[in-house]
Amino acid sequence: MTNNEILRRIQHALNLKNAQIMKAFEQAEVTVAHDKVANWLKDESDKSCVKMKDQELAVFLNGFINLKRGKKDGEQPKPEVTLTNNMILMKLRIALDMKAEDVLDVLEVVGINLSKYEIGAYFRKPNNKNYKQCEDQLLCDFLNGVQFTNRPDSEEFTG
């Protein structure tokens, strides 16, 4: 999945307005224009779509954590230059104040049944022997589960 698609899915799953996305960036001490957010959210087939970089998505996710959980005193975390699906899943889990059991419940909503041990493998450090790489499909399923949990009457996100 592209960063643009991930941002669109997050927006759809949590029913976020563009202004709320801009506010998340502000919480990470970065200002983005409404036009830039709108261009990130456009379908990749649209010529005015602007490709979102890993670092930009990392800034959004860090700001989203601050927005949802409260900003910590002191220096803000530096945004990662390269993001993995595992990092994105972890940041979303933190922002949404979820424990491993909550993630399992969200995945169960979309028919994915994992054990606590299996889900824990996605939250380990990459050099851990039990680390498991989060594939696009699992991240997509997680976001669909979040959507159906937060917006039970919504339809599956298709684009």
PLM regions with names:
Residues 62-113:
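Short, solvent-exposed interaction modules
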Residues 2-5, 83-87, 137:
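Alpha-helix N-cap/N′ positions at the starts of helices
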